[in-house]
Amino acid sequence: MVRIVSKQPRKQRKARYNAPNHTRGRFLSAALSPELRGKYNSRRTRVVKGDTVKVLRGDFAGDEGVVDAVDMKACRLVVHGVMVTKADGTEVPRPVDPSNVQITKLNLKDKLREERLGGGA
């Protein structure tokens, strides 16, 4: 089956917005740290709850924290410690795009994920 892919930005945005859940995981991958990259012979992997990530871009660049939640609909991550203060003084989590983070420690509680990553044979 041939997939026709458009170059047009509006159609690219529409495809991301209307993507089914089983393909949204592709948008939720992030770069691995140099140490993990060498260990697993892989450059990127899907971010899951429990991974430790370092924010590379934006106001929170340099902050490191554990992923508290992964928002499949918005394709965003909620990282522990990345908070903004509202006008009334309450703090709320600031969602981060997966392309702006680097995975520094993997959550390997899922044996299938560990097997899929391999040990760098």
Swiss-Prot record:
<dbReference type="GO" id="GO:0003735">
    <property type="term" value="F:structural constituent of ribosome"/>
</dbReference>
<dbReference type="InterPro" id="IPR014722">
    <property type="entry name" value="Rib_uL2_dom2"/>
</dbReference>
<dbReference type="InterPro" id="IPR008991">
    <property type="entry name" value="Translation_prot_SH3-like_sf"/>
</dbReference>
<dbReference type="GO" id="GO:0019843">
    <property type="term" value="F:rRNA binding"/>
</dbReference>
<protein>
    <recommendedName>
        <fullName>Large ribosomal subunit protein uL24</fullName>
    </recommendedName>
</protein>
<dbReference type="GO" id="GO:0006412">
    <property type="term" value="P:translation"/>
</dbReference>
<dbReference type="GO" id="GO:0015934">
    <property type="term" value="C:large ribosomal subunit"/>
</dbReference>
<dbReference type="Pfam" id="PF00467">
    <property type="entry name" value="KOW"/>
</dbReference>
<keyword id="KW-0687">Ribonucleoprotein</keyword>
<keyword id="KW-0694">RNA-binding</keyword>
<dbReference type="InterPro" id="IPR005825">
    <property type="entry name" value="Ribosomal_uL24_CS"/>
</dbReference>
<dbReference type="InterPro" id="IPR005756">
    <property type="entry name" value="Ribosomal_uL24_euk/arc"/>
</dbReference>
<comment type="function">
    <text>Located at the polypeptide exit tunnel on the outside of the subunit.</text>
</comment>
<dbReference type="InterPro" id="IPR041988">
    <property type="entry name" value="Ribosomal_uL24_KOW"/>
</dbReference>
<dbReference type="Pfam" id="PF16906">
    <property type="entry name" value="Ribosomal_L26"/>
</dbReference>
<keyword id="KW-0689">Ribosomal protein</keyword>
<keyword id="KW-0699">rRNA-binding</keyword>
<comment type="similarity">
    <text>Belongs to the universal ribosomal protein uL24 family.</text>
</comment>
<comment type="subunit">
    <text>Part of the 50S ribosomal subunit.</text>
</comment>
<comment type="function">
    <text>One of two assembly initiator proteins, it binds directly to the 5'-end of the 23S rRNA, where it nucleates assembly of the 50S subunit.</text>
</comment>
<feature type="region of interest" description="Disordered">
    <location>
        <begin position="1"/>
        <end position="30"/>
    </location>
</feature>
<dbReference type="InterPro" id="IPR005824">
    <property type="entry name" value="KOW"/>
</dbReference>
